[in-house]
A protein has these predicted regions:
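Phosphate-binding and adjacent anionic-ligand microenvironments
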Residues: 1-74
Length: 74
């Protein structure tokens, strides 16, 4: 997950750069998996989850989204 300030954890979908990146990854996995991004209810985190067939690639994409969210919302 992406560690962010608690008051900004719900803002990830309002940031155009983050939203565009998430949409691009969703299109990439369309039909072969799914992308789920959500704010944690109990921690100052935005959870980044991707499902698909290539675990190494999924991990790489999830880390890059988490890093982007941390950079933009910290």
């Amino acid at each position: 997950g992406a560690k962010v300030s608690n008051d900004k954890k719900y803002d990830f979908d309002k940031d155009a750069v983050i939203r565009n990146t998430i949409e691009a990854v969703e299109k990439e996995f369309e039909g072969n998996g799914r992308v789920l991004i959500r704010a944690s209810g109990t921690e100052p985190l935005v959870r980044v989850m991707i499902e698909g067939t290539d675990q190494e690639y999924i991990t790489e994409k999830a880390k890059s989204i988490a890093e982007l969210i941390e950079q933009r919302l910290s």
